[in-house]
């Protein structure tokens, strides 16, 4: 098996067999299953609805739910890695073909990926921001009054106190910056804000 873009980890042995099972689905069945998957990828909190849709798909297409869950788990391997690494539709298609999915189905999935990319990217950014959410920020200016380096005496510095939410608790993070570092930091924050406004 060739190298994958979505992960460096070894791929579970079941994946190859699951891709062969997917290849046996008709175009209509694969399209319906892909639809269910993208509903889940764009609204990952709706787990119960996702499982209900899988059960319905299994019943409609006379497929056992156990094997179907394994197939879906293998199918999610690429999009989950692609979200973390920001892969293109072309890389998603290549990874599916490397795993053994037929070219026709890999192209279909990558086209769906391209259509849903903005929504998925927005969700991924939201998840990243929720991991370390900035709750509060305080700053103080100071002037260096004594230093072993003569040129540093009288230079202005800035102390930042960031209150970051990690899970259910908050943590204080302290940073000391020189004035040029602070302006550079401010510039980066402006760029982040502009990027975030593009997504909202």
Curated annotation (Swiss-Prot):
Transmembrane segments: none annotated. Residues 133-200 form the COMM domain. One of its GO terms (molecular function) is NF-kappaB binding. It holds the Pfam family COMM_HN. GO terms for cellular component: cytoplasmic vesicle. It is found in: Cytoplasmic vesicle. Its main location: cytoplasm. InterPro entries: COMM, COMMD4/6/7/8, COMMD7. Scaffold protein in the commander complex that is essential for endosomal recycling of transmembrane cargos; the commander complex is composed of the CCC subcomplex and the retriever subcomplex. May modulate activity of cullin-RING E3 ubiquitin ligase (CRL) complexes. Associates with the NF-kappa-B complex and suppresses its transcriptional activity. This is COMM domain-containing protein 7. It comes from Bos taurus. The gene is COMMD7.
């Amino acid at each position: 098996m060739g190298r994958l873009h979505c992960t460096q980890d070894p791929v579970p042995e079941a994946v190859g067999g699951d891709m062969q099972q997917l290849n046996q689905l008709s175009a209509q069945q694969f399209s319906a299953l892909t639809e269910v998957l993208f509903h889940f990828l764009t609204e990952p909190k709706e787990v119960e609805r996702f499982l209900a849709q899988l059960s319905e798909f299994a019943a409609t297409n006379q497929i056992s739910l156990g094997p179907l869950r394994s197939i879906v788990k293998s199918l999610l391997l690429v999009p989950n890695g692609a979200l973390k690494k920001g892969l293109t539709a072309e890389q998603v298609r290549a990874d599916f073909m490397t795993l053994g999915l037929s070219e026709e189905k890999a192209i279909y999935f990558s086209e769906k990926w391209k259509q849903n990319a903005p929504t998925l990217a927005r969700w991924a950014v939201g998840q990243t921001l929720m991991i370390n959410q900035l709750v509060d920020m305080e700053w103080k200016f100071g002037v260096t009054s004594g230093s072993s380096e003569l040129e540093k005496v009288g230079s202005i510095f800035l102390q930042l106190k960031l209150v970051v939410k990690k899970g259910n608790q908050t943590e204080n993070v302290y940073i000391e910056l020189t004035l040029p570092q602070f302006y550079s930091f401010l510039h980066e924050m402006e760029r982040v804000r502009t990027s975030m406004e593009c997504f909202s």
